[in-house]
Amino acid sequence: MRTDEGFVRAWTMAAEIAPERWRAMHADMILVLRAASWELERGRSDDTLAVLRGPEGLGQVRIQPEVIAFNGNAFLGEAGDPFSIERVAERGIIARRSRDGSRRVVRRCDTRGQPYDLAVCAVLLTLLHHLGD
């Protein structure tokens, strides 16, 4: 399989996540990112660049109280679309409301099959666990 054909991950979720629910999910996403990073870095020498980087493919993974965002390493040619989850979405909100009346947000991330796809999939499974469908 060619890695340039795209690995597009797309999902919808609530446009706003309740603070208590976000705190639990945020903590689990950090644990999952640490585990994914450990797996991605296993067997690599200490002088190589980290696989997971900030949303632009540079710097540190962005872990803030209301946002988690990351990408692959741009220096290694392993960056694709940034992956970002926010407690309160500011973009991508669709007008149609879900059954419970809340607004939804549409998200996508094309990792192009780069190594950080592992972290993207792991975080998406964490979202599914906490938020359901």
What does each model-identified segment do?
Residues 1-133:
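Acidic (Asp/Glu-rich) sequence patches and key acidic residues
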